Amino acid sequence: MDTNEGDVRFENEGSLEPLPVVRERTVVMRAVGLTKIYAAVSSGGGSGRGALELFRGLDLKVHAGEMVAIVGESGAGKSSLLHLLAALDTPTAGEVWCGETRLSSFTPKQAADYRNRDVGYVWQFHYLLPEFSAQENVAMPLLARGTRRAEAMERAAYWLGEVGLADRADHRSGELSGGEQQRVSLARALVTEPKILLADEPTGDLDGKTAETVFGLIQRLHEVHGLTSVLVTHSLEFAGRCGRVLRLREGRLVDATLESKP
């Protein structure tokens, strides 16, 4: 059971400056004619019948500074769509662009570099490395790209402060509550100062009060740091607090912003 998740203190006054707020309406990410079909696998391991088509000809534009929620029924393909935007998977047809970069042109190394440089990804489960401290976990993406350890740890300390966990920097993941673990994973996603934040059900494993704290924190960071954010969520309440709501229905994204507002 998470405790004290509503009491989040931020301790970065006088430390590193927040990122400038982005005000242009530049298209940061777009998907054009996106199709994803999973081939069925037979019990013998070969191809079987009944392939699963999640979407066909799907289009999406995300503008700088937007906070976009994607909602839909279970199995509609929300997480699969986010995986395509993060180059964690490849589409059957169509293209995903981040700025002027076409993701389908990536080699595996380029895809990994893209995820380290341009995209911050928050999973439903935190995936923190248990043998390392919270600060070391947050620093990992910077260390992976060759940043000096002292600089990486300084940036990690800053982002832990931004998620209200400056006093938990030396704690390992097993010593943190569920909400604290997810806040560490959020800091890890943002430590590289990505062009876009992708979050896949970031509150899905949390109880009501803790989920509110984590979602409120995402909102705060989005506004303070001028982020561009795309969130998959099953919570219509949280979705309604985003600037734009898209519903994935029958393989298409439809604007559901008005119906999602309270």
Predicted regions and their residues:
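ABC family nucleotide-binding domain
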Residues: 27-241, 245-248
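ABC-family P-loop ATPase nucleotide-binding domain
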Residues: 1-37, 255-262
